[in-house]
Amino acid sequence: MTQKNLCLYFQIHQPTRLRLYRFFDIGKDSHYYDDFTNRTILKRVADLCYLPMNKLLLELINQHKGAFKVAFSISGSALEQFERYAPEVIDSFRKLADTGCAEFLCETYYHSLASLASEPEFKHQVLKHKAAIEHYFGVTPVTFRNTELIYSDNIGAQVYDMGFHTMLTEGAKHILAWRSPDFVYSDDRQTRLKLLLRNYSLSDDIAFRFSDRSWAEWPLTAEKYLGWLKNDINTSAGDVINLFMDYETFGEHQNAASGIFDFMKYLPETILNDGTFRFSTPSEVAKACKPVSSLEVPEPISWADEERDVTAWLGNELQQEAYNKLYAQYEKLALVNDPALYNDFGHLQESDHFYYMCTKFFSDGEVHKYFNPYDTPYEAFINYMNVLSDFIIRVDEEYSATVAKFATSENQETEKKKPAKKAEPAENKKTKTTLASEKTVKAAKKSAGKAVKPEAAKEKKNSKPAVKKAVKKKSE
C-alpha cells in the first residue's frame, strides 16, 4: 500500500502593537508602538509556546531519525521581536533548521495585505522576507504562503513570477464544491504553480476544539485522531492531508494543562507505527504529487471565519478607509529615501490592525480577541487613524523636500550643460564699455535740464515695493 502524505505547517506571527496615540500627539510624536506590551506578550508566548514546542519538535525529529517533519512560516515582524526581546527563540528555530526536517516558508515580511493593494509593494515584502529567512536560518525558501493563506488567481500568478512553484491556501468549500482538499491542485492561470489546500476540519480539531470540554469528542487522543485521519483519506482517496494552524495553538491558545503537549508528543509515534501516512514538508508533497486539476479563484480567499474570504480585514467602512488611506501613500514613499518612514509604512500594513477594526463575529474571534488591545473596533479605528495622520504628515514633508532637492539638482545639471560663452576680444569689450558710458552721459545731460516736482520726488522716495502676504495653509 502506498503511503499517504501528512503535512504539518505552523504559522508564527506577532504584530507590532500600537500605543495609545491621541489626537494631540499628531505632529509632535512619531513613535507609534507600545514597546512594553509587545515585549510582555512576546516574552510570555515564548515561554508558553515557542521555546517548549520547539524543544519538543527537536526531540521528536531526533527520536524518529528524520521521519517526522514540519514546516514553519515566521513573519518578519515576529523575527524582529524575537531578535529584540527573545533571541533564544531564534536559536531554537535554527536548531530545527539544522536538522533538515523543518521547511521554512516565504511570506510577506510584515504579514500584510499588500497582495491585495500593490503588486510592487507585495514583491518588495516577499523578497525582503526571503532575505530574512536566508539570513537567520541559512536556507532559501521555495514554498510560499500568503498572509492568512490569502489567495486568488491574480495573486498566484504574481507568486509564480517571483520564482515559487508551490503555494499554500485554504480548502474553501465554495471553491472546491464537491472536490476534496486532500489532493494537490494547480493555479488556474499558471498551471505550473502547485496548490496545497488546508483541511480545515481536521486542522481545527486541534487548533480550536482540543480543549473544549463541551465538544462531543473531548478528550482528543492521538489514537482517536489517527482514526479520523485514516477515515478522511480513505473517503477522499486523496494523496495528502494538510494540517495548517497557528503555532500559538500549543501552550498559548490551548494551555499546557489541556494536555496539548502530551498529545503532540505521542501523535508522531502513533502515526508512524500505523504506517498509513508519512510526514512530508510542503515542497516534498509538491514534488511527490501531481495536480489533479486547476482551481479557479477569481476573488481572494483566506482561512479566516466561516466565509473564508477577506472580510475579516476589509469588510466594513472603517477598515476600507484606513486601508485605502494607508496605501495611497505608496507612490510618494516610492520616491523618497527614508528607511524610518518605510519601516513604519511596513508595520502599519500589518493585517492585525485591520482585524482589530472588524465588527463581525467569527468562529475564531475569541482567539484574536485575546491579543486585541482594544475594547471596541471603533477605538482601534480612531487610534490607528491618529497614527496614520501623523505618518502622512511626515510622508508629505519628506516628499516635498525630495521634490525640491530633485528640482534644484536638475536645474544645476541644466546650467552645467549650457554651452560656455565665447571670450570676447579686449577691443570689443572696450568699445562696448565706451558706448555704454557715452549713453549714460547723454541720458544724464538730457535729464538734467528737466525740473522735478517736489511732490513727485517725495512720492518716489517714499515708495516701497509691494510685498505679498504669505498665507499659511492650516493643516488638516
What name fits each language-model region?
Residues 412-476:
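Intrinsically disordered, polybasic Lys/Arg-rich low-complexity tracts
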Residues 115-117, 175-183, 205-206, 289:
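Short, charged, surface-exposed secondary-structure boundary motifs
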Residues 11-15, 75-77, 109-112, 138, ...:
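An acidic- and aromatic-residue-enriched active-site/binding cleft used to recognize and process polar
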Residues 3-10, 16-118, 142-145, 165-170, ...:
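Short, well-structured secondary-structure segments
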Residues 2-51, 62, 182-193, 197, ...:
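Active-site and substrate-binding clefts of carbohydrate-active enzymes
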Residues 54-58, 90-94, 123-133, 156, ...:
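Generic structural signal for well-ordered alpha-helices
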Residues 121-148, 229-244:
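CE4/NodB-like, metal-dependent polysaccharide N-deacetylase domain
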Residues 89-106, 127, 139, 160-197:
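Acidic, His- and aromatic-enriched active-site or binding-groove loops in soluble protein domains
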